[in-house]
Amino acid sequence: MNGQNIRIRLKAFDHRILDASTREIVATAKRTGAQVRGPIPLPTRIEKFTVNRSPHIDKKSREQFEMRTHKRLLDIVDPTPQTVDALMKLDLAAGVDVEIKL
């Protein structure tokens, strides 16, 4: 795998499990002899929802909810075949979305 990079994008609603998964990926890649760039924190997407508190009247009384999507970016430079095997076998937390590009 000469001259090839693996780009990993991680997304989660909880930043603590996202950071734990990132640390796990970095440790696995370094243990197998690959060079890691990152983790690079990407902008957090904040999605806000405004709803009426009352089911019937009183438009002035509202409540806001928000959903934050935290993102991280990792680049693994010149991965070895052992690195790819170790990353495929890695078991991450349930709330983390992993997107891998070669």
UniProtKB/Swiss-Prot annotation:
Top-level lineage group: Bacteria
Keywords: Ribonucleoprotein, Ribosomal protein
SUPFAM superfamilies cross-referenced by the UniProt entry: Ribosomal protein S10
Keyword Ribonucleoprotein applies: yes
Subunit relationships: Part of the 30S ribosomal subunit.
Function: Involved in the binding of tRNA to the ribosomes.
Family: Belongs to the universal ribosomal protein uS10 family.
Name assigned to this protein: Small ribosomal subunit protein uS10
Organism of origin: Xanthobacter autotrophicus (strain ATCC BAA-1158 / Py2)
